[in-house]
Amino acid sequence: MSSFLSKRFISTTQRAMSQLPKAKSLIYSSHDQDVSKILKVHTYQPKGSAESSILLKTLAFPINPSDINQLEGVYPSKPEKVLDYSTEKPSAIAGNKGLFEVVSLPSGVKNLKAGDRVIPLQANFGTWSTYRTCESENDLIKIEGVDLYTAATIAVNGCTAYQMVNDYIEWDPSGNDWLVQNAGTSSVSKIVTQIAKDKGIKTLSVVRDRDNFDEVAENLEKKYGATKVISESQNGEREFGNEVLPKILGPNAQVKLALNSVGGKSCTNIARKLSPNGLMLTYGGMSKQPVTLPTGLFIFNSIRSHGFWVTANSKRDPENKRKTVDAVVKLYRDGKIISPKEDIRTLEWDVNNLSDEGVLDLVNRGIATKGAKNMVVLKW
């Protein structure tokens, strides 16, 4: 009898040890332009066990435009909807990027330990959740030596900036090479100027006209290393382009790269500043206007125009994604670049005290706040 009870106790204990903690996630099973109609808070018991799965505790996740576009159903990359979360309909967990802490891991995992901070290697990970599980350490990238905000956004802002500057142009170290970019106040642009400065590349950043233009320009030049900041009206003025710009660039300047995340007239005007054989990379379209380029730039200046999508790059070459993250982390740790933290708006998710309705309201407010860069930080 005692032997039977002993075996039963051991069996019960083993099951208890194997069970993963319940996760609370923001899920969706359909799409809508009004994402508040389809986003739900759902608590479920994750599949798998502590002996087979890496258990991750979420520390923070950004609310990016790509996350919202996925919920709307208009983003090219979408997670598969599945029945793994104890839902009536196939569902997906929202969120692509985020920072996690390793809670526990199977004995076979060699390169991670409890307490390590990690980010997903690929998109569609489902980061808007208290806990996530991962079956392979190869699907994670370890992050050390940078702050929470930087780590949670590095896969988007840092990797985008680094790859655009480093992977497309053969730069001349003489100091005469330039790049031009619109959306000069964006987080990506602020990182671009710093990476470029570290490589000896000069930057011309274009920003929207505003009452405090001089203040904004001074901040971008002194804090983030832009060589020169101009307004969109200057960007489009023929007189400025013919008379003032050559003095800014210098006699031997080569504008080899244009970075476009706006489209429309802004895109046309930065393309006009490219030197012959220059390249324009388009990585966004904030104006929702098409990329419009004069025919003469192609025929007489032989410029090139390509799209850039960091998600596709990561999927095509995962190893380069790892190398990019490592390189960007090193730049941060060496003090070569800093994160534009003043742009961020922090939303706190108190895991132990915030109700489901409160969590949903918190995230929906972050989604609805136009122009803000929202970061949800989980308080444990």
Swiss-Prot record:
<dbReference type="GO" id="GO:0008753">
    <property type="term" value="F:NADPH dehydrogenase (quinone) activity"/>
</dbReference>
<keyword id="KW-0521">NADP</keyword>
<feature type="transit peptide" description="Mitochondrion">
    <location>
        <begin position="1"/>
        <end position="17"/>
    </location>
</feature>
<dbReference type="InterPro" id="IPR011032">
    <property type="entry name" value="GroES-like_sf"/>
</dbReference>
<dbReference type="InterPro" id="IPR036291">
    <property type="entry name" value="NAD(P)-bd_dom_sf"/>
</dbReference>
<dbReference type="InterPro" id="IPR051034">
    <property type="entry name" value="Mito_Enoyl-ACP_Reductase"/>
</dbReference>
<dbReference type="Pfam" id="PF08240">
    <property type="entry name" value="ADH_N"/>
</dbReference>
<keyword id="KW-0809">Transit peptide</keyword>
<keyword id="KW-0560">Oxidoreductase</keyword>
<comment type="similarity">
    <text>Belongs to the zinc-containing alcohol dehydrogenase family. Quinone oxidoreductase subfamily.</text>
</comment>
<dbReference type="GO" id="GO:0005739">
    <property type="term" value="C:mitochondrion"/>
</dbReference>
<dbReference type="GO" id="GO:0006631">
    <property type="term" value="P:fatty acid metabolic process"/>
</dbReference>
<keyword id="KW-0496">Mitochondrion</keyword>
<protein>
    <recommendedName>
        <fullName>NADPH quinone oxidoreductase</fullName>
        <ecNumber>1.6.5.2</ecNumber>
    </recommendedName>
</protein>
<comment type="subunit">
    <text>Homodimer.</text>
</comment>
<comment type="function">
    <text>NADPH quinone oxidoreductase that efficiently reduces 1,4-benzoquinone, whereas no activities are found for menadiones and methoxyquinones.</text>
</comment>
<dbReference type="InterPro" id="IPR013154">
    <property type="entry name" value="ADH-like_N"/>
</dbReference>
<dbReference type="GO" id="GO:0050136">
    <property type="term" value="F:NADH:ubiquinone reductase (non-electrogenic) activity"/>
</dbReference>
